[in-house]
Amino acid sequence: MEKIWFQNYPKGSEKFLDTSKYESILDMFDKAVREHPDRPAYINMGQVLTFRKLEERSRAFAAYLQNEFKLQRGDRVALMMPNLLQYPIALFGILRAGLIAVNVNPLYTPRELELQLQDSGAVAIVVVSNFASTLEKVVFNTNVKHVILTRMGDQLSFGKRTLVNFVVKYVKKLVPKYKLPHAVTFREVLSIGKYRQYVRPEISREDLAFLQYTGGTTGVAKGAMLTHGNIITNVFQAKWIAEPFIGDHSRTRSAILALPLYHVFALTVNCLLFLELGVTAILITNPRDIEGFVKELKKYRFEAITGVNTLFNALLNNENFKEVDFSALKLSVGGGMAIQQSVATRWHELTGCNIIEGYGMTECSPLIAACPINVVKHNGTIGVPVPNTDIKIIKDDGSDAKIGEAGELWVKGDQVMRGYWQRPEATSEVLKDGWMATGDIVIMDESYSLRIVDRKKDIILVSGFNVYPNEIEDVVMLNYKVSEAVAIGVPHAVSGETIKIFVVKKDDSLTRDELRNHCRQYLTGYKVPKEIEFRDELPKTNVGKILRRVLRDEEIAKRPKH
């Protein structure tokens, strides 16, 4: 497709990015440390971690993995923790050891964790003690041989560390009992690792950096193989958007990092972009605690914040949020789900800063398109493809869509994954001659901006997290009182979408509460259906396939538009 969207690029901005500056993420890391050794890299719970300390501790972590665990290049290491200082230390330690990082949602149920560890073949895992009991239940069914255990406050000063760990365990009782007798502690790893020799591996752009798990219409989680080159390219593409706002490298700038780092949007557009820009990332461990989050925001004059619609909306609905100092705020980025017009308008009215909306998918590291910086207000589009990205819009008949016509968005660029881990058939379904089928139906309007009109996939998007209908249905069908079940996403004012399940009973005694409690045993909270409707029968095709779209259309028709 001719790159007519270049007309929307800001005047003087680059249309092609030279990303050859780095051969690997390690090179990008080394440059950041070299240029800003004493600048704060991360702040969490008031504790500062400078770039120099990050280098020292991640090197010790890498040396321990190389010498004590004897891990070999290409081995997979899982990370299961919220936003703590331990995360970047472990992440860069894993990458610096030549290993592959596997991000795990710490809220996973034992079943979900087991499936991901089995599929990735991870041989080691770093887990925070709050979720160690989940790991204990499944670790012996996986390839995991080494467990590194950390506590919430482990990277804080002695007094604060002691207090935080005590409160978390004994006052708030957030650490269920567990038994992992062969685990080593995070602090042990660092104290021993600093006396071990670190050998810097030769890493190329083609080497894998991450197995980032996503899903599909089959409901089976798949590991997107993201290389060092994929990530570097996407960091430069994100930098193209952010640098005009916060590009003054000569001084310390700060950004709020509330999205979980195990999510690909936060990983690339926050963690690694801010590393490249030399920006101080203020880690928010529990953004669901809005009162605590706002209290933390009041402590800083921050230049940037990233979030999803749900998060921006929750902040705006908090009375104390208006007391935050927004005088330095230059960049607000929304991703993961559509930003609602009402939220964008209220955000600008309060902060004086527009939300720049981005669009992407895990398989593309994730950034594909964004509203350019010269768009002065939220316009409901996903903007234009970022530099070094080709797109085509294909109609159902296989022909190219014209301006104003709907079709499936296909993407090509160096940010596109190598494929799905050990799933060649699934890879061939979405990757053809370097082109990635997004599954999203889009229109390019007369201003050459892209607008999503539908999702070809049946994925449900809850607060920026993908939920796969077949996974929900499989869990519901485990209940012996259920005859048939089908899950859909329905519009929700706060989370974008929520899950509704339609059920045909096998036993009339089945209740909604009973079914919800059943689901909670197997599914993370955001995957548990919020709405349950019992029906005598479900709409089907002549061959007996349930018509999910019929149910979705019925729901959309009877609900107010948000």
Swiss-Prot record:
Membrane topology is: Peripheral membrane protein
Q: What EC designation does it have?
A: 6.2.1.3
Give any Gene Ontology cellular component: membrane
Reaction catalysis annotation: a long-chain fatty acid + ATP + CoA = a long-chain fatty acyl-CoA + AMP + diphosphate
The metabolic or biological pathway listed in the UniProt record of this protein is: Lipid metabolism; fatty acid beta-oxidation
One of the GO BP terms on file: fatty acid beta-oxidation
Q: Does the keyword Ligase apply?
A: yes
This chain belongs to the protein called Long-chain-fatty-acid--CoA ligase
Q: Which organism is it from?
A: Haemophilus influenzae (strain ATCC 51907 / DSM 11121 / KW20 / Rd)
